């Protein structure tokens, strides 16, 4: 046993296992789950602790190495009080999902102590803070607020108590008290692991689980693929075991006997389209997974090619002819090019995780999910259980970004193993699994053509997209161009190209960033050919009223207005500015919200989940405004499927669904409270007094339809898309309970970049973003989320490079040491402007922003690189080798 001091108290490990890591001792033996395991490689900093006054990562630290030493975790920073850094993080909303927050807080507290001792009264600069926190990553992208919080804490501005911060759960996140699915520990809980295929394409010929059941500590084993089944990608689930600990579970997996009949495999977009390529789905039935958020319609197949789907084209045949004729005559105003985007891993810091527990025929699942209400129904259907017997809980969710919307392997394994073992089972993916088999933003090839007339009008547009989502289909990329730019003829065609790779998944604006990267560069090229300002051309071609206002706003911003003065187009380091625009649909669900008075206090509840967006605080703020109270006066209960039916966190529908429902509930409750208080309290008494004097009452309201908008003629963008658009709109409402609202969100962004022409490095030095999403319900949290979306877009444009073994399809960048996401030093200061008009027909006046905020980032950066260096990069990420090769050729690459 190893003895050491833990948060000021003596502690001793349970055994002398030489392979035992400090993080395992803290989480599994001491129950201090504030210290998080993310990368397991010392890269992300989430597991940071203080050992004898210095910070260290506990995921690499042998437990024996701390013998006789002092270890402080986030729980022990300030005892029952809050450390100044924790207060600063609360005040500045220096977090989103909160999974990485304890590590940041511990590191920042160490910086605070050394800074205050050496330089009291001074404020550290952004570069000094970035250097100190360089070993920490935040996938949500809360870096700007983190820098502000650390700077003010080190300057001594948080030495005393503070008022409540903007985020209700902030104190739990900065102290490590917030409980995520991976932190759940039931009495007698077992650990589950999944055995995965080592073949990219094979027939499963044998599967024997009996040897695993003979391994000491193994309590259950299940098959996840049947003998004779087709194995279609490396990492596909084969079987799973549950054991008393992870070590026993690993031995159980190793004992399972598996037989394969290897079959020819095809890896990637180009190989799958090659003549004679092995077929992923050779039979007439094509059991392909859905990589999109919408329903799948019957679509023709030709070997590995699914499509075309061109239902949202507008005079597509005319567009095709106009562009073909322009090519034939070599029209100088024709812009045409092929663009490539690579897959992007979601990289949520809390992995896919499920803990299942049966009680008779009732099932409780703690699940890291973006859809607790939906998942409760899906689990009931999948396992043949009544919906009233299933409860899904997600108190906190450590990120998702689209990857946690459906039932996946961890849920199936946990539920089946728990039933087989007769005990609770947790299945939590390790980082390699999380970044290999849980989905990714599909890559694509886009062929784009724009034809302008002699007077500068847009005559025709063509977008053909070939999506690369592995064994999955249903990507929509080209279709979104129907809602961008007013061309009388548009040929918009989507294809899916299947190959033996894990299925892709929705990721923040599915299809949108890919289209924007290609289309917005083509618009810039058209402006160059027409010799007009790129912003002015967009203003002419784009009739959307929301974006029209944003173009006018952007024209006045120094980053755009003064770009000729700030540009540097010679020498090694060059600077340029690029612009891009985007749109996204406005969606909402017919959800319910319960508003209640209990014990003289007002509370709101619904079965929604918070993965960092701050929906708790949005609900509290909305209720507080309706009743003239403060946000902290409102109780909020979410994260439980037994509450009023809530929305999925996807497609930017959450706030747009819940706020109108809550306002409807507020109107009902006000009427009821007035009626009950009549004769007891004056008619003009403030709501605070009426609520305090009221008996307990609870009522629910459903999200009402929007009022007709005169601007949009009462129609959604899909309903304006002809017969097919109206049909798609109906299918969404009928089968997915998803309504497409009137109008769409808009974005107009400008990026300034510096290009190192010697080393090929590109960095973003300034970023200015304009968003049109109607009334912003919680400005502090909205700004934080928008900035994080932009930072994910910067990663997509410059750094994130998912590499595969060309023979097997195994992901070679399945760790944060190999797959680079932006760190705090990679991100610029970001200025965000919200145009809050245009959605007065929506109760509450606003819609969602999580998707739209990511869409135009990569395009704006690519356009800025062209402005700075004179070369156009048609492939992302914009790696140094690609940039240098383009500079050497002096042409697009």
Regions found by a protein language model. Give the residues of each.
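Glycine-centered tight turns that cap/initiate beta-strands
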Residues: 70, 211-220, 389, 455, ...
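Terminal domain-initiation and capping elements
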Residues: 159-172, 262-289, 293-317, 323-324, ...
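Short glycine-rich loop/turn motifs
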Residues: 1, 44-45, 190-191, 227-228, ...
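C-terminal catalytic domains of large/alpha subunits in multi-subunit enzymes
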Residues: 123, 384-391, 419-425, 476-580, ...
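Intrinsic disorder at enzyme termini
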Residues: 9, 127, 131-181, 554, ...
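Signature of N-terminal electron-transfer/Fe-S-associated modules in redox systems
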Residues: 1-164
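Extended, polar/acidic
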Residues: 156-378, 500, 504, 550-583, ...
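Short acidic, glycine/serine/threonine-rich loops at helix termini
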Residues: 108-112, 143, 151-152, 252-255, ...
């Amino acid at each position: 046993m190893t003895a050491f001091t833990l948060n000021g108290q003596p502690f001793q490990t349970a055994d002398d296992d030489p392979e035992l890591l400090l993080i395992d001792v803290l989480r599994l033996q001491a129950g201090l789950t504030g210290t998080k395991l993310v990368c397991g490689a010392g890269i992300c900093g989430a597991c940071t602790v203080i050992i004898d006054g210095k910070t260290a990562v506990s995921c690499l630290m042998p437990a024996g190495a701390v013998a006789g030493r002092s270890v402080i975790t986030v729980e022990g920073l300030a005892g029952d009080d809050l450390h100044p850094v924790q207060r600063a993080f609360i005040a500045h909303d220096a977090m989103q999902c909160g999974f990485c927050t304890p590590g940041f807080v511990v590191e920042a507290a160490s910086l605070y102590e050394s800074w205050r001792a050496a330089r009291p009264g001074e404020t550290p600069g952004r570069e000094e803070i970035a250097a100190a926190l360089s070993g920490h990553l935040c996938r949500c992208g809360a870096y700007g607020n983190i820098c502000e919080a650390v700077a003010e804490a080190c300057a001594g501005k948080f030495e005393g108590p503070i008022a409540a911060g903007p985020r209700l759960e902030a104190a739990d996140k900065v102290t490590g008290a917030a409980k995520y699915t991976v932190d759940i520990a039931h009495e007698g809980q077992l650990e589950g692991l999944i055995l995965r295929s080592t073949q990219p394409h094979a027939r499963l010929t044998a599967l024997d689980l009996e040897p695993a059941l003979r391994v000491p500590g193994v309590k259950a084993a299940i098959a996840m693929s049947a003998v004779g089944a087709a194995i279609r990608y490396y990492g596909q689930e084969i079987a799973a075991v549950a054991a008393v600990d992870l070590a026993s579970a690993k031995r159980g997996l190793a004992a399972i006997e598996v037989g394969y009949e290897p079959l020819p495999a095809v890896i990637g977009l180009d190989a799958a389209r090659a003549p004679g390529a092995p077929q992923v789905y050779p039979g007439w039935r094509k059991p392909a997974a859905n990589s999109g958020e919408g329903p799948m319609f019957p679509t023709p197949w030709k070997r590995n090619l699914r499509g075309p789907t061109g239902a949202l084209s507008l005079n597509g045949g005319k567009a095709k002819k106009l562009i073909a004729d322009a090519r034939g005559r070599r029209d100088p105003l024709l812009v045409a090019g092929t663009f490539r985007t690579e897959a992007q891993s979601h990289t949520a810091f809390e992995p896919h995780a499920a803990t299942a527990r049966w009680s008779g025929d009732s099932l409780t699942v703690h699940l890291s999910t973006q859809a607790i209400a939906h998942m409760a129904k899906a689990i009931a259907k999948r396992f043949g259980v009544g919906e009233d017997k299933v409860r899904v809980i997600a108190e906190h969710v450590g990120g998702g970004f689209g990857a946690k919307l459906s039932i996946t392997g961890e849920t199936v394994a946990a539920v089946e193993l728990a039933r087989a073992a007769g005990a609770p089972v947790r299945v939590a993916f390790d980082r390699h699994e999380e970044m290999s088999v849980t989905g990714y933003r599909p890559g694509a090839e886009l062929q784009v053509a724009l034809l302008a007339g002699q007077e500068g009008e847009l005559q025709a547009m063509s977008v053909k997209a070939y999506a690369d989502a592995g064994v999955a289909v249903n990507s929509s990329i080209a279709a979104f161009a129907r809602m961008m730019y007013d061309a009388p003829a548009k040929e918009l065609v989507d294809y899916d190209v299947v190959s033996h790779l894990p299925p892709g998944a929705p990721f923040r604006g599915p299809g949108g960033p890919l289209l924007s990267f290609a289309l917005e560069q083509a618009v810039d090229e058209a402006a160059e050919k027409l010799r007009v300002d790129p912003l002015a051309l967009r203003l002419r071609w784009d009739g959307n009223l929301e974006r029209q206002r944003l173009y006018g706003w952007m024209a006045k911003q120094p980053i755009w207005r003064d770009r000729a003065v700030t540009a540097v187009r010679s020498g090694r380091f060059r600077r340029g500015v690029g612009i891009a625009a985007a749109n996204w649909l406005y969606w909402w669900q017919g959800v319910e919200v319960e508003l209640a008075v209990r014990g003289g206090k007002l509370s709101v509840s619904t079965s929604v989940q918070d993965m960092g967006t701050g929906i708790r605080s949005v609900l509290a703020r909305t209720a507080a405004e309706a009743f003239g109270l403060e946000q902290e006066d409102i109780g909020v209960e979410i994260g439980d499927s037994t509450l009023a039916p809530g929305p999925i966190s996807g497609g930017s529908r959450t706030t747009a669904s819940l706020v109108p429902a809550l306002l409807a509930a507020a109107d009902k409750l006000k009427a009821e409270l007035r009626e009950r208080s009549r004769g007891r309290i004056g008619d003009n008494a403030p709501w605070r007094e009426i609520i305090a004097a009221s008996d307990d009452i609870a009522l629910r309201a459903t999200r009402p339809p929007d009022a007709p908008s005169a601007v949009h003629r009462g129609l959604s963008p899909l309903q304006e898309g002809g017969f097919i658009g109206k049909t798609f709109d109906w299918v969404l409402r009928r089968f997915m309970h998803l309504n497409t609202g009137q109008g769409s969100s808009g974005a107009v962004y400008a990026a300034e970049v510096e290009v190192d022409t010697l080393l090929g490095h590109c960095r973003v030095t300034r970023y200015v973003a304009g968003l049109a999403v109607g009334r912003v319900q919680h400005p502090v949290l909205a700004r934080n989320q928008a900035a994080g979306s932009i930072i994910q877009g910067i990663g997509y444009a410059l750094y994130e490079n998912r590499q595969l073994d060309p023979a097997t399809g195994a992901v070679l960048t399945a760790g944060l040491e190999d797959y680079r996401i932006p760190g705090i030093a990679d991100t610029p200061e970001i200025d965000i402007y919200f145009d809050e008009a245009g959605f007065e027909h929506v109760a509450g006046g606003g819609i969602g922003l999580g998707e739209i905020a990511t869409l135009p980032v990569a395009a704006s950066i690519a356009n800025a690189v062209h402005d700075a260096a004179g070369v156009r990069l048609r492939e992302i990420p914009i790696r140094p080798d690609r940039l240098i090769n383009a500079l050497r050729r002096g042409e697009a690459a």
